[in-house]
């Protein structure tokens, strides 16, 4: 069975192995054991309530119970930019006009921005390539919304997600080559790694404080502004079906888009509801679990011992029938409450 749970210290080796499969461009999961260990500790301290909001970050793992192995991760930062500045480019417009010359021209620009300061961030989503099947990807991504819905008081009014921008097969970023290289004089992979391991002071020190004219960039760079890496396209689609949208903000390194939404308007947050657990052995004649039913995310409401699974079911009343195996995976007993939401919007066919 596949289940999502909070990260534990014993997961470090598996997460380090996962980090080696991410490739260039995933700044929040560098293959650095010391950094990953610190990230795990920060998550544990977040659950213990010992950190300020600007330091808090939840880290979840997708575990294959049969193999006893972590095969994916996803995370939520509670409030970005409160300790270290949060940078991106806002894609804007400057108008150059002259009545005397009868000239009026709109020029696209990139403005260095801290506009998302204080927002909650969905981040660090990565799934082992061998497990990119059976709806594991949407499960790992959207389960964060059930956690947010259950513990809404901990999160901002807005949620954002930075999408990995385009890089070629050699790990080269056209956007970086046309923008970042001129200011940093280092390779994209190096800047990416420094940012991912928390060494971000160089961004504030070296990034331009004045708007950049998009027309001055190479055509190859202009073409990838707001575009995602091919491997990230499914993750973007998952979030867009939940209501997150691109609003003209891009990553300062690779030009990838930032998606955003009002937290309470996210479909899985808004539509999630509670059900009372009934535990029964499997009987197809009187049991709600049905391979032809709708896929649902199901999670307990235990803050420190959060658990979530994916199941097929037909909802007929305020109860949710679980097998003993599913109840054990969730850490719930008969009469407990669970939170549930369909994996996809009802009108979305999958």
Swiss-Prot record:
Catalytic residues (UniProt): 229
The record's gene field reads astA
Q: Does the keyword Acetylation apply?
A: no
Q: Which NCBIfam families match?
A: arg_catab_AOST, arg_catab_AstA, PRK10456.1
Organism expressing this protein natively: Yersinia pseudotuberculosis serotype IB (strain PB1/+)
The protein's annotated catalytic reaction(s) are: succinyl-CoA + L-arginine = N(2)-succinyl-L-arginine + CoA + H(+)
This protein's name = Arginine N-succinyltransferase
Q: Which InterPro entries does this one have?
A: Acyl_CoA_acyltransferase (IPR016181), Arg_succinylTrfase_AstA/AruG (IPR007041), Arginine_N-succinylTrfase (IPR017650)
Q: Which PANTHER family match?
A: ARGININE N-SUCCINYLTRANSFERASE (PTHR30420:SF1), N-SUCCINYLARGININE DIHYDROLASE (PTHR30420)
Molecular functions (GO terms):
arginine N-succinyltransferase activity
Pfam families found in the cross-reference section:
AstA
Give, as in the UniProt entry, the pathway in which the protein acts. Answer: Amino-acid degradation; L-arginine degradation via AST pathway; L-glutamate and succinate from L-arginine: step 1/5
Q: Could you say which EC number(s) this protein's record lists?
A: 2.3.1.109
Q: Quick one: a GO biological-process term for this protein?
A: arginine catabolic process to succinate
Where are the annotated coiled coils located? none
């Amino acid at each position: 069975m596949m289940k999502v749970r909070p990260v534990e210290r014993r997961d470090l080796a598996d997460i380090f192995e996962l980090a080696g499969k991410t490739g260039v461009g995933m700044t929040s999961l560098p293959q650095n054991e010391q950094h990953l260990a610190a990230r795990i500790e920060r998550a544990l301290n977040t659950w213990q309530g010992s950190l300020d909001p600007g330091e808090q970050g939840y880290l979840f793992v997708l575990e294959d119970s049969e193999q006893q192995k972590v095969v994916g991760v996803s995370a939520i930062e509670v409030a970005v930019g409160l300790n270290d500045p949060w940078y991106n480019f806002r894609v804007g417009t400057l108008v150059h006009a002259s009545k005397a010359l009868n000239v009026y021209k709109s020029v696209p620009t990139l403005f260095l921005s801290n506009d998302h300061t204080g927002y909650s961030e969905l981040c660090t989503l990565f799934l082992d390539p061998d497990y990119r099947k059976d709806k594991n990807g949407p499960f790992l991504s959207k389960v964060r919304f059930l956690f947010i819905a259950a513990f809404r008081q901990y999160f901002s009014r807005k949620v954002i997600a930075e999408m990995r921008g385009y890089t070629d097969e050699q790990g080269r970023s056209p956007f970086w080559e046309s923008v970042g290289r001129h200011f940093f004089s280092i390779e994209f992979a190096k800047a990416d790694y420094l940012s991912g391991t928390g060494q971000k002071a160089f961004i504030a020190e070296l990034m331009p404080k004045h708007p950049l004219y998009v027309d001055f960039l190479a055509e190859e760079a202009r073409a990838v502004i707001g575009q995602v890496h091919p491997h990230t396209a499914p993750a973007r689609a998952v979030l867009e079906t939940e209501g997150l949208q691109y609003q003209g903000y891009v990553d300062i390194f690779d030009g990838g888009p930032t998606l955003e939404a009002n937290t309470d308007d996210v479909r899985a947050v808004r539509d999630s509801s509670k059900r009372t657990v009934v535990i029964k052995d499997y009987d197809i004649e009187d049991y709600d679990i049905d391979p032809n039913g709708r896929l649902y995310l199901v999670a307990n409401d235990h803050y420190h011992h959060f658990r979530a699974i994916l199941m097929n079911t037909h909802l007929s009343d305020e109860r949710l029938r679980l097998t003993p195996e599913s109840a054990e995976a969730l850490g719930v007993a008969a009469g407990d409450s669970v939170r549930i939401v369909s994996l996809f919007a009802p009108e979305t066919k999958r």
